C-alpha cells in the first residue's frame, strides 16, 4: 500500500502550503507551510502543526497563544500540492495580530483596507502565558 505522504507533491524545500479554514463557516483563517513530519503529526494528534520557515522548527499552532486549531478534516487538492485543514479555531483567533483571520484586509479603491477588528491585543496574547 502506498504511503499517503508520498502522494503529496512537496516543493523543492520539502514543503507544501496548508490553508486552515473554519470547519463550520468555511472562512479561510490562515496559510502556513507543512513538511512531512508536521503533516504526519497533524494527522496523528488531530491538531494543526506547521513548519516554521523563519524559526526552522515545528510550530504547534497555539503553543504560545493557546489558540490551538483542532483538526476536523484534511483535504488534498487535485494537483496534490496544496492541503486544506478544516479546523476548529480555539479562542476564535488565528492571526498573530489578534484577529480571527490572517486575511483581514480587503482591496478597495486601489488600496488595502483593514476590515476585521483586533479581538485581543497581541501583547496580551504572547505575554505571561496568554
Curated annotation (Swiss-Prot):
Pathway: Amino-acid biosynthesis; L-histidine biosynthesis; L-histidine from 5-phospho-alpha-D-ribose 1-diphosphate: step 3/9. GO terms for molecular function: magnesium ion binding; phosphoribosyl-AMP cyclohydrolase activity; zinc ion binding. Belongs to the PRA-CH family. Homodimer. One of its GO terms (cellular component) is cytoplasm. Its EC number is 3.5.4.19. The gene is hisI. It comes from Pseudomonas entomophila (strain L48). This is Phosphoribosyl-AMP cyclohydrolase.
Amino acid at each position: 500500500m502506498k504511503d499517503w505522504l508520498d502522494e503529496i507533491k512537496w516543493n523543492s524545500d520539502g514543503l507544501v502550503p496548508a490553508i486552515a479554514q473554519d470547519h463550520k463557516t468555511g472562512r479561510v483563517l490562515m496559510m502556513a507551510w507543512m513538511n512531512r513530519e508536521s503533516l504526519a503529526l497533524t494527522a496523528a494528534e488531530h491538531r494543526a502543526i506547521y513548519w516554521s520557515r523563519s524559526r526552522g522548527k515545528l510550530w504547534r499552532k497555539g503553543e504560545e497563544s493557546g489558540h490551538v486549531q483542532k483538526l476536523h478534516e484534511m483535504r488534498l487538492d487535485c494537483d496534490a500540492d496544496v492541503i486544506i485543514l478544516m479546523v476548529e479555531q480555539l479562542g476564535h483567533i488565528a492571526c498573530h495580530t489578534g484577529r480571527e483571520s490572517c486575511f483581514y484586509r480587503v482591496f478597495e479603491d486601489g488600496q488595502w483596507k483593514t476590515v476585521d477588528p483586533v479581538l485581543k491585543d497581541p501583547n496580551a496574547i504572547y505575554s505571561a502565558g496568554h
